[in-house]
């Protein structure tokens, strides 16, 4: 796992925008973007933010665009202050592959008893954090190079590519 100093060294030119105050001892804090997807419908957060009701699931995205080198991977994790209110920032997709480039899609779920107001932007409380890992050597097939890299270069709240297969999802 990378320390704050290594995060500065490796990722200060690979996270856009990179804010030094977002670097933690072993992670980088991420900001919430303004686009949400609820049941496949795109919703922009208004001036009051986006309300995530109890039991509600929505896709969102980070403001930051990440460029992972072929020598590193990352884990997306929630922030404890949000977690204590019942917010999950990812359901199962918390891994960022070497070679990934794009905004990170968040899988938001409110497991708490109260509605949560989520405010997008760099001045709002961080929504999630990335911890980074150095690989033992550069990977031979970084994400985006081969077939199956469905989300390479994604921006915004990107939905599942599996829903294109009618036998997986029923609308």
Q: Model regions: which residues?
A:
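DUTPase catalytic domain/fold
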Residues: 1-171
